[in-house]
Amino acid sequence: MSEIVNLSSSLRSLNPKISPLVPPYRQTSSSFSRPRNFKYHSFTDKICLAAERIRAVDIQKQDGGLQELDDSPVSVELGPICGESHFDQVMEDAQKLGESVVIVWMAAWCRKCIYLKPKLEKLAAEFYPRLRFYHVDVNAVPYRLVSRAGVTKMPTIQLWRDGQKQAEVIGGHKAHFVVNEVREMIENDSIT
């Protein structure tokens, strides 16, 4: 389901070297992640164009000065955890760095999990890079790992520090409530 985006003549006039047609971006479907390849074009410091979304950004202030653009990510893809050894490695790495880790336990068949994931990716961007977010597909890892983490419902979002579970949110209700609870969980951990 790819589209060719036809650039208007006004956009083409800003950068005459650009083709009037922007090729489609690659999108592969997966149970949880959607890798994306974008095609970016610049137009004289005024407009940034990506084939997935078109966004105009005016970087000149009214007084003629330049406005700094925030280059922090809008969302950060949750890193997959594929098994017990990988889970242990993530915990060990975080412990060495003295960081906490957020683990989102999901299932491919869980509609609430699928709906919540992009919202958690946006939340992950707020705490990036000091806090890493990962996801585990409970059907793709051994049951020992799921049991070890104490997961009984999906989605379950857990905060881990020093190899120990510190707190968890079970996300069976509205996504914005879950995201707020996860945010509070993270902020409460950073206070202690």
UniProtKB/Swiss-Prot annotation:
GO terms for cellular component: chloroplast stroma. Residues 66-191 form the Thioredoxin domain. Gene3D superfamilies: Glutaredoxin (3.40.30.10). The active site is at residues 110, 113. GO terms for biological process: cell redox homeostasis. Residues 1-55 form a transit peptide. It is found in: Plastid, Chloroplast stroma. SUPFAM superfamilies: Thioredoxin-like. InterPro entries: Thioredoxin-like_sf, Thioredoxin_domain, WCRKC1/2. Keywords: Chloroplast, Disulfide bond, Electron transport, Plastid, Redox-active center, Transit peptide, Transport. Transmembrane segments: none annotated. It holds the Pfam family Thioredoxin. Disulfide bonds join 110-113. Belongs to the thioredoxin family. Probable thiol-disulfide oxidoreductase that may participate in various redox reactions. PANTHER family: THIOREDOXIN-LIKE 3-2, CHLOROPLASTIC (PTHR47192:SF4). This is Thioredoxin-like 3-2, chloroplastic.
